Regions:
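N-terminal transmembrane-helix/juxtamembrane module of multi-pass inner/ER membrane proteins
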Residues: 2-95
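C-terminal membrane module of polytopic membrane proteins
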Residues: 203-204, 216-257
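Membrane-interface loops
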Residues: 44-55, 67, 105-198, 242-257
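Alpha-helical transmembrane spans of integral membrane proteins, capturing the lipid-embedded, hydrophobic core
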Residues: 23-35, 94, 98, 119, ...
Length: 257
């Protein structure tokens, strides 16, 4: 058994233990800093968040694209859809992201560092959005017919729980990092796996997550668009600046296995 583990170690740890520890620390530090800044809420932020959300509603109505109430109302008529979407929002987003990053690190190590950089850059861009444009999500506007689908699904009010944690900000809606991260992972995995059905499934994942965040009233569709734009900008920066600076280490290697 020990011999077998030693034989597997070079593949599981393509750059050795020090690099693995370094990657874990980078993500842990970036994520904690992201959550800490993201969780900064005060009275001014709360007032501004609702005002910004009303501005979004006004803009979407002027474009005749205020579709979020209709999307959720349709989902609520089909309990299995709203329950599945709520489950996806709570349980699938983070495990899929972490699992994909682990797979990339082990099996597509040459591409992992580029994707890592895109994630870290996108977190930084998202934090700017949360500070500059705090926005209340649709679920906080029952007057428009919205329900908190996720709270109904898990059995307690997530916004009430959020007020007890300095790491949670109910007004961190713009951009949608659920959509941003889903797009980063979805595009990356669709280019790095071999089975056609799996490539197709990963390519649909960002669209699925966009539907999930809207039907559960956690984001406006404009949040989702800005989340996708955040991923695009982060990818452009990672390619134009970082990958050029260290092409042998930080460039994307798109070969499938």
């Amino acid at each position: 058994m020990l011999t077998r583990l030693r034989a597997l170690a070079p593949r599981a740890l393509p750059n050795g233990w020090p690099d693995l520890v370094r990657q874990v620390l980078i993500f842990a530090a970036a994520y904690y800093a992201y959550r800490l800044v993201r969780g900064a809420v005060d009275g001014h932020t709360t007032a501004a968040a609702f005002e910004h959300a009303r501005d979004i509603i006004g803009l979407e109505r002027s474009l005749h694209l205020f579709v979020e109430p209709s999307v959720q109302a349709w989902g609520e008529t089909k309990p299995w859809i709203i329950d599945f979407a709520s489950w996806m929002y709570v349980n699938a987003h983070l495990p899929l992201m972490i699992g994909s990053l682990i797979w990339l690190y082990i099996f597509r190590n040459r591409s992992y560092y580029f994707i890592r950089n895109v994630f870290v850059i996108s977190m930084g861009i998202a934090l700017v959005g949360y500070v500059v444009f705090p926005t209340a999500p649709p679920r906080l506007f029952p007057e428009w017919g919205f329900q908190d689908s996720v709270s109904n699904f898990i059995g307690f009010n997530t916004d009430t729980a959020s007020t007890t944690s300095s790491l949670v900000n109910p007004f961190a809606a713009v951009p949608s990092v659920h959509v941003c991260f889903a797009l980063i992972i979805g595009i990356s995995m669709s280019r790095l796996v071999r089975p056609k059905w799996l490539r197709f499934a990963w390519s649909l994942y960002p669209l699925l997550m966009t539907f999930v965040v809207i039907v559960t009233a956690n984001h406006w569709w404009m949040d989702a668009v800005l989340g996708a734009l955040t991923a695009l900008v982060a990818g452009t920066i990672a390619q134009a600046l970082l990958a050029r600076a260290r092409p042998n280490k930080w460039a994307f290697a798109g070969a499938r296995i």
